[in-house]
Design a protein with these regions (language model features):
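A short, compositionally biased domain-edge/stem linker segment
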Residues: 1-3
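Active-site beta->alpha loop and helix N-cap motifs at the rims of alpha/beta catalytic domains
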Residues: 7-135, 139-152
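Catalytic alpha/beta core domains of metabolic enzymes, predominantly
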Residues: 107-255
């Protein structure tokens, strides 16, 4: 299928929503539209349990005014204790109501500490799910939140495994807790572009992650996952910071 969520001409600015109720999400979306974003990231796992209903979802997607939505429904940070089958059911509802890029964990149906499963049964179920989502006209991102510094060889192994499962975007999150680890992560960002034949979202958390979060999207023409505001403990750049970097790099067609 033709890739549409990730831009080919420059990094895509994705406004990552952090609110937990429908009314607050609509207000946050409106503010982000005024700041200028290409798309939205709807982190469904943090939405309050009593706010999870079709009426609210329709209101949220409508507020995006036609901008595409990337949706996550992780186990981590989820306010409910749900099985992977239940999490998947919620994703299908969100797709029917307007989501365009769906995030599936790389350990879906076989939970692992680093979110990377090699279980053949789980992988086959993942592939069938990916085919179902493609048939619904949406794109699929597969994520592995390793959440520790990870050498290139291991990152490449995970990325190739994700690619082989039939997704449209590869996502891996590690850490950088020293200048050396930060430098290695920049090298990994560049190396993945030569080995992976699809958009790659390689991110890191940790004490030294900010430079990578700000500059790596310019190296791999990837996604800027950006927030409305920054502050202590916030790894993601703000929307304004992302746009400033793109302007400095010579991009003028910004939202």
């Amino acid at each position: 299928m033709t890739m549409s969520f990730v831009r080919k001409d420059r990094p895509t600015i994705v406004g990552m929503l952090r609110s937990t109720t429908a009314d607050l999400l609509v207000a946050e979306i409106d503010r982000m539209l005024q700041q200028g974003v290409d798309a939205f990231g709807f982190q469904h796992e943090i939405v309050q349990a009593d706010e999870r209903n079709e009426e609210n979802y329709k209101k949220i997607f409508s507020a995006m005014q036609g901008k595409p939505a990337y949706i996550t429904n992780y186990v981590r940070c989820n306010v409910l204790d749900l099985t992977d089958e239940q999490l998947t059911e919620e994703l299908f509802l969100l797709v029917k109501l307007g989501a365009k890029l769906v995030d599936l964990r790389c350990d879906l149906f076989d939970r692992q500490p680093d979110e990377y499963s090699t279980d053949p049964v789980a992988i086959e179920k993942q592939k069938k799910l990916i085919d179902q989502l493609h048939a619904m006209g949406v794109e699929v991102l597969m994520s592995a939140h390793v959440l520790k510094y990870t050498p290139y060889e291991r990152v490449l192994e995970i990325a190739l495994a994700q690619q082989a499962r039939g997704v449209d975007v590869v996502k891996i999150v590690t850490e950088a807790n020293s200048e050396q680890e930060l430098a290695e992560n920049f090298k990994i960002s560049l190396a993945l572009q030569e080995q992976i034949k699809m958009p790659v979202l390689f991110l890191c958390n940790g004490t030294h992650c900010r430079k990578h979060r700000i500059f790596a999207p310019l190296l791999d023409n990837g996604l800027y996952l950006a927030g409305e505001y920054g502050g202590p403990g916030v790894n993601q750049p703000t929307i304004q910071e992302a746009k400033e970097q793109l302007q400095l790099a010579g991009y003028n067609d910004l939202p």
